[in-house]
Amino acid sequence: AMSSMKVAQAEYGMGMGYGISRLHGALCSGTIDGKDANGTAYFQKVCVQAPSPPWFWGMLHLDDGSYIDWFLPHVSPTITAKDSRPWKNRDITHLPLSMGGLFHDVSRNRSEKFSEVRVERTCDEGGLPTFHVHMWNGITEIRIEARAVTRAHWTFDQPTRGGMKSHLTYNEYPLDVTRLEIDDEKGVRNRSDWGVIRGNAEHSWGLLH
């Protein structure tokens, strides 16, 4: 399931919509600092023909082959942001436009979707966020705390009407998972039930149109 390509697309009308092709966990091998390495990697190709509001997205790869994915496009005061400076005073709340989560659970031999997803953030002294993720679907409830270890970001300034520009800052954060709790009909699992967990999160602000 991890190395099978999944395709999703949606059309909103008036020629606007998106398409995405994803490999949730492609098996990879290579060298790092001259040493052989094996693992999994997430790949995606996204085509968007629509205004891009802010979003939260994250992906965790667990060492047994399981993965957890969440996505939360939203409206917030940061939609008016015009630069890449993090943790603006207006970054205080957000209103989800949609919510989606996925847990491919190897030990339970199933994949579960989640339509209830909450994402909150706290910030350390260096300006890096910790993401607090809560997902549930009536069968399984997942709680995650994942600390960003660094930040990479890209900015887009696109000319629009009247000589003005629309702006989008897109952030990537490699994650250190400090808490993981999965509660389902068979019991509770936590961070100690897995060894290595690797992940990445995205957070954006502004509105590209």
Residue ranges and their predicted role:
Residues 1-209:
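Structured soluble/peripheral alpha/beta segments that form catalytic or ligand/cofactor-binding pockets
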